[in-house]
A protein has these predicted regions:
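Active-site beta-loop-alpha junctions of metal-dependent nucleic acid enzymes
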Residues: 18-43
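Active/binding-pocket-proximal capping segment
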Residues: 24-25, 35-36, 56, 68-75
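Hydrophobic "anchor" residues on beta-strands that sit immediately upstream
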Residues: 51
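Coil-to-beta-strand transition motifs
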Residues: 11-16
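C-terminal domain-tail junction helix/linker
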Residues: 106-184
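RNase H-like two-metal-ion nuclease catalytic core shared by retroviral integrases
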Residues: 54-56, 63, 67-70, 79-104, ...
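Short helix-terminating capping/connector loops at secondary-structure junctions
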Residues: 43-48, 74-76
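Single conserved hydrophobic/aromatic residue that forms the stacking wall/gate
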Residues: 1-8
Length: 184
């Protein structure tokens, strides 16, 4: 079975979440948005996702279903699309995608990975300090703005600086050696 990644970035902190999907469809994105809405609760979801900026991929072809809350008849967010061939409009996203490629080089298959593997990878990336965040990590910055309880709901864990690994061998299981993973 082919698996597809879905990432979402919180611009104020550069924290990125990533999810595996079993299809590259709008239904798979709606399922993730619904899950986030349920896990976070309406108030926190609305605070974190007032707007979703995305590309014009087919997985975002049903904006009304992404925008509306499934439990009550109201909108939970608003979808906006970047211009075609304009990745610079989501620059912070591209920086994190480059960090992902350090661990999973471009062209890597996600098919042997689990959500726990993806969460582990993102915990390492989100714990990596950035100059643009005044030498704080996305995890630390997000925690300052929104609190540890929200990070816990999102299955985010801080990785100590000395343990951060942004290399291919982080996910040894992917490369044929069984390993335990955290997160998920």
């Amino acid at each position: 079975q082919t698996l597809f990644p879905y990432t979402t970035l919180f611009r104020s902190s550069s924290l990125m979440l990533a999810f595996l999907r079993d299809a590259n469809t709008s239904a798979s994105v709606i399922e993730i948005i619904n899950l986030l809405d349920e896990v976070l609760g309406a108030k926190t979801f609305n605070s974190l996702f007032p707007v979703i900026l995305t590309d014009n991929g087919s997985e975002f072809s049903n904006p009304k279903e992404i925008e509306k809350r499934s439990t009550i008849p109201c909108n939970r967010t608003k979808i906006f699309y970047c211009d075609p061939s304009a990745p610079y409009q989501k620059g912070a996203c591209e920086v994190n995608h480059e960090l992902i490629r350090r661990i999973l080089p471009k062209g890597s298959s996600f098919d042997e990975l689990t959500q726990q593997d993806i969460t582990l990878m993102m915990n390492h990336i989100n714990s990596y300090k950035r100059k643009k965040l005044n030498n704080r990590s996305p995890y630390e910055t997000f925690s300052f703005y929104y609190g540890e309880d929200v990070l816990e709901k999102l299955a985010c864990r801080q990785v100590p600086a000395k343990d951060i690994m942004l290399k291919e061998n982080l996910l040894k299981k992917y490369f044929g050696t069984e390993t335990s993973t955290i997160g998920g």
